[in-house]
Amino acid sequence: MSVTVQMLVDKVKLDVIYGTQELLQKEIATADISRPGLEMTGYFDYYAPERIQLLGMKEWSYLTQMTSHNRYSVLKEMFQTETPAIIVARDLTIPEEMLLAAKEEGIAVLQSHVPTSRLSGEMSWYLDSCLAERTSVHGVLMDIYGMGVLIQGDSGIGKSETGLELVKRGHRLVADDRVDVFAKDEETLWGEPAEILRHLLEIRGVGIINVMSLYGASAVKDSSQVQLSIFLENFEKDKMFDRLGNGNEDIELSGVKIPRIRIPVKTGRNVSVVIEAAAMNYRAKQMGYDATETFEKRLTNLIDQNEASHD
């Protein structure tokens, strides 16, 4: 997904001090944000002009102590064709030399009242989300008790119907059919719907329904971290399934591993309730309580007691 300067302006509510419509449509190539410190002294080795240039109190203070000529020279060298924009935080005064250099080089000048570190974090979060490489997977992504659960399985097994039942039980739909996943970092996976499928569920025999229209805004979510994969598969009498919950299986999506739980599906089984329980049990494990481990300890103690009674 490409991101323009205008999209960034709208998302983090920046003020446009200078920028034609053409300049605001310039694409941002990287999520990295530069705080030009050494560049202010004239040291431009390893300078990354393709990044958003963000000036906070320290950079601004140093810049304002320069002579007008030196200030213009530094800014002129800093502003290059591939530079998307320069942003001044904290509503600090924009030097005239900055506007002059920006107009000459064709660089948008933006301003924000937000403190520098917070502004940098907001922009990084947004740009990382937009510019991260995406992988499309088949399934239903639900927010269950605040945890992102990716429901997968063979076609026709009832993933969308299960998603609808979970919505009726108070959980939130993120995406149905196609889920676009991307890595926020090495350990964090996020998912979102394809734009054309946002808020929609396809139910066999009924057709396409708009979950937001039928159940309200509280029933949908635009994106979610993906923390758990539930794989639905047809129940087979002779097939072995994990009965104790101590079988560890992971899947890797966009370079991030997440745990997977396989749930057998057969007529009469309330799959949505089972998925709720699986999600809550996984969260309990993350908080340090493992029911399987507790059971195994009780079983071991019982065996030890029986052996002691026979001695």
Swiss-Prot record:
Binding residues annotated for ATP, in chain numbering: 153-160
Domain of life: Bacteria
GO molecular function: ATP binding; magnesium ion binding; phosphorelay sensor kinase activity; protein serine/threonine kinase activity; protein serine/threonine/tyrosine kinase activity
GO BP, one annotated term: regulation of carbohydrate metabolic process
Active site residues according to the UniProt entry: 138, 159, 177, 243
Keyword ATP-binding belongs to the record: yes
Reaction catalyzed: [HPr protein]-L-serine + ATP = [HPr protein]-O-phospho-L-serine + ADP + H(+); [HPr protein]-O-phospho-L-serine + phosphate + H(+) = [HPr protein]-L-serine + diphosphate
Cofactor(s) the record lists: Mg(2+)
Region (Important for the catalytic mechanism of both phosphorylation and dephosphorylation): 201-210
Binding site for Mg(2+): 160, 202
Transmembrane intervals: none
Enzyme Commission number(s): 2.7.11.-, 2.7.4.-
Entry keywords, A to Z: ATP-binding, Carbohydrate metabolism, Kinase, Magnesium, Metal-binding, Multifunctional enzyme, Nucleotide-binding, Serine/threonine-protein kinase, Transferase
Important for the catalytic mechanism of dephosphorylation: region residues: 264-269
Note: Both phosphorylation and phosphorolysis are carried out by the same active site and suggest a common mechanism for both reactions.
Record note on quaternary structure: Homohexamer.
Function: Catalyzes the ATP- as well as the pyrophosphate-dependent phosphorylation of a specific serine residue in HPr, a phosphocarrier protein of the phosphoenolpyruvate-dependent sugar phosphotransferase system (PTS). HprK/P also catalyzes the pyrophosphate-producing, inorganic phosphate-dependent dephosphorylation (phosphorolysis) of seryl-phosphorylated HPr (P-Ser-HPr).
Domain characteristics, as noted in the entry: The Walker A ATP-binding motif also binds Pi and PPi.
Family as reported in the entry's similarity comment: Belongs to the HPrK/P family.
Protein name, as recorded: HPr kinase/phosphorylase
